[in-house]
C-alpha cells in the first residue's frame, strides 16, 4: 500500500508539473540567468553574484547548454524540474513522515507549481538540503559526502546558503569533539575552500548593481500572505501559532531549535537590509521547517507527543499552501515567446526595449532558426527609463522615424517633449493585456 501511494502521488505530480513546464514561458529572472551563463566563462563565473545576488552553481549548470544555444527554454526548465523531482523522490523515500503529510507537501504550491516550473536557482538548492537531512543522523560516518553537499547547497543561492551553512557548522563541531581529528581536518579543508569561493562572490556583491536592492525592508503584507490565502489578521494569528508551536516542540533538540531560529532571523534580516524578498524566497522558510522536523524526527531527541504536534502543524501548513493560487497568473503567463515572435516578424525595424523585456525575449530571438540580425536588438542600448534616458532614445530613433517601443504595461503612454522634438506614441499591438507595443514617431 505504501508503494502504491507513492506511485500514485509521484505520477500525478510528474504529469501536472511537466504540463506546466511545457507551456511555461520564462520570465526575466530565468532568461537573464541563461544570458549570464551564455556570456561568461569559468574565470569570471563568480562575478555573476554582483548582478543577480545569487551564487554560481545555477549558471555553471546552464553554461554548456547556453553556450551551445541548445534547446531554450526546455534544457533550462528540465534541469530545474529534474532537481525538484529528485527532491520529491528523496522526500518520499527517506523522510520520517506519514504518507498523508508527504502527499500534502508534494502537492503544496511551492513543490507543485513554483519550484519545479519557474527555472531559478532555488530548486537545485532544495535537493542537497534534503540529502543533508537523510545523512544527518550518520553524518559522522560520511563526513566528506556530507560536507560536499553543504558546499553545493551553499553555492546555489544566498537563501540556500543561509539554510545550509549551520548544518555544516554542526558537523565541524561534532567532529572536533572526536579524538581522531583526521575527518575534522579534511572537512575543515573543504569548509575553507567553500568559504573562499563564497567570499570571492560576496566581495563582488554590490547592492548598487541590483535595482531591487533599493527597496529596503521586507514587505510584511507579502510575508503574512506567503503561507495562507486568508485575511491578513487570520494570517498573523496562524503564523504566530506556527511560530510558537514549532519552537516549543523543537526546543529539546537544541541543534534544530537553533537551526530554525538562525535561518528565520538570517533570511528576514537579509530581506530587511538588502532586498524585500518575494513569495518564492519566503517559501524557503517552509523548506527549513520541513528539514528541521525531518532531522528532529530522525535524531529522536524530542518526545512522541512533540512529534505528533509537529506533524499536525506541518500538515496544516502544507494544506493551506495547497490552496495558494494567488500567484498563478504572474508565475505562468509571461508570454515572452509571443513578444519574441512579434519582434521576429518586424526584424527590419529598429527597436527600443523598456523594463526587462529585452532580456526576457532575447534567448527566443537567438534560437538559431531565423535569419534575424541580433545586432539590431543589441544596438538599442538595452533598457531605458523614458524620463531619464530621453536623449539616448532620441539618438537611436533618429535614423528611422517609424520604430517600436516595448513596455510591460498597458497604461497610456503620453507624448514626450524635449526642446523642439516631440515623441508621439501610437498603440500598435496589445499582447494578452500584458504588453503594449507602440509605434514611435519623432516630430521636430
Predicted regions and their residues:
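Transmembrane-helix signature of polytopic, membrane-embedded enzymes
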Residues: 3-6, 91-111, 126-127
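Signature aromatic-anchored transmembrane alpha helix within multi-pass, membrane-resident enzymes
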Residues: 6-9, 189-192, 241, 300-323
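Transmembrane-helix motifs of polytopic, lipid-linked glycan transferases
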Residues: 7-11, 78-100, 247
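Membrane-interface alpha helices of multi-pass inner-membrane proteins
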Residues: 15, 45, 113-115, 130-131, ...
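Short hydrophobic/aromatic helix or loop-helix immediately within or flanking a transmembrane segment
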Residues: 34-36, 42-43, 48-82
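Short acidic/glycine- and proline-prone juxtamembrane loop motifs at membrane-interface regions
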Residues: 117-123
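Short periplasmic/luminal acceptor-recognition loop of GT-C membrane glycosyltransferases, typified by
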Residues: 328-337, 345-393, 399-414
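Aromatic/acidic, Gly/Pro-rich catalytic loop(s) in extracytoplasmic/lumenal soluble domains
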Residues: 393-444
Amino acid at each position: 500500500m505504501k508503494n502504491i501511494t507513492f506511485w500514485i502521488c509521484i505520477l500525478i505530480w510528474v504529469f501536472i508539473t511537466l504540463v506546466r513546464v511545457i507551456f511555461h514561458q520564462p520570465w526575466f529572472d530565468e532568461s537573464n540567468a541563461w544570458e549570464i551563463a551564455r556570456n561568461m566563462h569559468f574565470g569570471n563565473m563568480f562575478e555573476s553574484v554582483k548582478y543577480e545576488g545569487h551564487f554560481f552553481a545555477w549558471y555553471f549548470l546552464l553554461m554548456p547548454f547556453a553556450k551551445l544555444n541548445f534547446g531554450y527554454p526546455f534544457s533550462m526548465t528540465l534541469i530545474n524540474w529534474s532537481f525538484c523531482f529528485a527532491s520529491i523522490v528523496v522526500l518520499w523515500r527517506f523522510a520520517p513522515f506519514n504518507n498523508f503529510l508527504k502527499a500534502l507537501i508534494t502537492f503544496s504550491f511551492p513543490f507543485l507549481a513554483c519550484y519545479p516550473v519557474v527555472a531559478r536557482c532555488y530548486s537545485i538548492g532544495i535537493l542537497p538540503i534534503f540529502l543533508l537531512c537523510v545523512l544527518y543522523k550518520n553524518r559522522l560516518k560520511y563526513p566528506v559526502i556530507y560536507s560536499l553537499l553543504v558546499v553545493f547547497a551553499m553555492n546555489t543561492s544566498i537563501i540556500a546558503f543561509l539554510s545550509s551553512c549551520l548544518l555544516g557548522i554542526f558537523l565541524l563541531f561534532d567532529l572536533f569533539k572526536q579524538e581522531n581529528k583526521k575527518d575534522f581536518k579534511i572537512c575543515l579543508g573543504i569548509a575553507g575552500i567553500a568559504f573562499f569561493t563564497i567570499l570571492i562572490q560576496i566581495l563582488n556583491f554590490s547592492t548598487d548593481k541590483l535595482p531591487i536592492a533599493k527597496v529596503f525592508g521586507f514587505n510584511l503584507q507579502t510575508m503574512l500572505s506567503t503561507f495562507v490565502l486568508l485575511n491578513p489578521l487570520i494570517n498573523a494569528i496562524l503564523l504566530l501559532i506556527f511560530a510558537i508551536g514549532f519552537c516549543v516542540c523543537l526546543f529539546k533538540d537544541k541543534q534544530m531549535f537553533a537551526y530554525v531560529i538562525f535561518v528565520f532571523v538570517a533570511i528576514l534580516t537579509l530581506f530587511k537590509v538588502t532586498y524585500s524578498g518575494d513569495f518564492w524566497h519566503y517559501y524557503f522558510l517552509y523548506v527549513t521547517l520541513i528539514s528541521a522536523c525531518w532531522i528532529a524526527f530522525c535524531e529522536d531527541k524530542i518526545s512522541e507527543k512533540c512529534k505528533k504536534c509537529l506533524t499536525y502543524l506541518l500538515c496544516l501548513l502544507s494544506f493551506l499552501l495547497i490552496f495558494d493560487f494567488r500567484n498563478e497568473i504572474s508565475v505562468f503567463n509571461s508570454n515572452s515567446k509571443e513578444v519574441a515572435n512579434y519582434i521576429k516578424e518586424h526584424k527590419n525595424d529598429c527597436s527600443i526595449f523598456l523594463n526587462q523585456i529585452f532580456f526576457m525575449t532575447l534567448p527566443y530571438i537567438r534560437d538559431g532558426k531565423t535569419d534575424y540580425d541580433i545586432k539590431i536588438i543589441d544596438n538599442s542600448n538595452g533598457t531605458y527609463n523614458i524620463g531619464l534616458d530621453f536623449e539616448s532614445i532620441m539618438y537611436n530613433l533618429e535614423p528611422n522615424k517609424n520604430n517600436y517601443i516595448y513596455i510591460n504595461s498597458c497604461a497610456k503612454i503620453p507624448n514626450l517633449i524635449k526642446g523642439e522634438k516631440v515623441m508621439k506614441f501610437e498603440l500598435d499591438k496589445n499582447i494578452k493585456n500584458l504588453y503594449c507595443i507602440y509605434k514611435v514617431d519623432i516630430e521636430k
